[in-house]
Regions:
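Terminal accessory/targeting
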Residues: 1-51, 69-78, 202-249
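Active-site beta->alpha N-cap acidic-glycine motif
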Residues: 20, 24-117, 121-141, 225, ...
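Active-site-proximal beta-strand/loop segments in catalytic clefts of secreted hydrolases
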Residues: 55-58, 81-85, 108-109, 145-149, ...
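Alpha-helical scaffold elements lining the catalytic groove of polysaccharide deacetylases
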Residues: 63, 112-137, 150-202, 217-218
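Residue-level detector of anion-binding/catalytic polar loops
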Residues: 77, 103, 165, 172, ...
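Noncatalytic linker/hinge segments flanking ATPase motor cores
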Residues: 94-98, 120-125, 143-151, 183-190, ...
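Residue-level recognition of the N-termini of beta-strands and the immediately preceding loop/turn
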Residues: 140-142, 203-204
């Protein structure tokens, strides 16, 4: 620890004392991996139609990789709202998501309903996820989606104290309902296309999950169809930048 106003500098072992040190919601470089590559960002055409397809509850040991491959087949990117506990299980996948230019966002640490938590538990859900992401890829999420969409003023204030923008969705495919259905992949595909085309048909945020086989299979089919109709698959941040889609407050 150093402070330019101090005449005498002191050194504190952060790893041994991390439970007693507040870092103003920021991690320290020594906790980040040193081999992280710069992300491969996509080129966005502001004049073309866009949809931001978001994937909750990962990373998954195999399906997250498959989802990334699906987006990249069409020069697209996704936004992955990941659980901190899963980031700790699969840090290499988190790192890959970041390096390949997809967006990593927070879905809290263990998918708790935040409106039912006290202030301390709420803070832990946010903080531990930020730390898990930083440890895996050297950066922290700037977007967060509350599990179940559950929010109130206390939850929103906690998000903003970490500099996090809350993102919900325009279309919920309810893909989890079809995870064990024989024709589930086709239903998910149809729902993704429906939600991408709803309202003005340009600039929607669509919700699926990258932890179900049928969801990712449905994603693959939907991307193929939507790409033929001129859609770009962009991150939430790019959607906000180019289409003016505001965060949800």
């Amino acid at each position: 620890f150093t402070d330019q106003k101090l005449k005498n500098k002191i050194t504190i072992n952060y790893k041994e004392n991390k439970d007693y040190i507040k870092l103003a919601n920021k991690n320290i470089p020594s906790n980040a991996p040193l081999d992280v590559k710069a992300p491969k960002l996509m080129k966005v055409d502001p004049k073309k139609k866009m949809v931001a397809i978001t994937l909750d509850d990962g990373p998954h040991k195999t399906l997250t990789e498959r989802a990334m491959n699906a987006f990249e087949k069409y020069n697209g990117r996704g936004t992955f709202f990941e659980l901190g506990q899963n980031m700790n299980l699969y840090p290499d996948i988190v790192k890959s998501v970041y390096e390949r230019g997809h967006e990593i966002a927070s879905h809290t640490y263990q998918h708790a309903q935040l409106t039912k938590l006290d202030a301390t538990a709420l803070d832990e859900e946010i903080k531990k996820t930020q730390e898990a992401c930083f440890k895996a890829c050297g950066t922290e999420p700037t977007l967060i989606r509350p599990p179940y969409g559950a929010k109130n003023d206390t939850v929103k204030s906690a998000f903003y104290s970490y500099g996090l923008s809350m993102i919900l969705w325009d279309g919920d495919t309810e893909d989890w309902r079809y995870s064990k259905v024989t024709n589930g992949a086709q239903i998910v595909c149809d729902n993704i296309i429906r939600d991408a085309k709803s309202k003005t048909g340009d600039g929607n945020i669509v919700l699926i999950h990258d932890i179900h086989e049928n969801s990712v299979a449905g994603l693959e089919m939907a991307l193929d169809q939507l790409s033929k109709e001129g859609y770009q698959f962009v991150t939430v941040s790019d959607l906000i930048k180019y289409k003016g889609h505001s965060e949800y407050r």
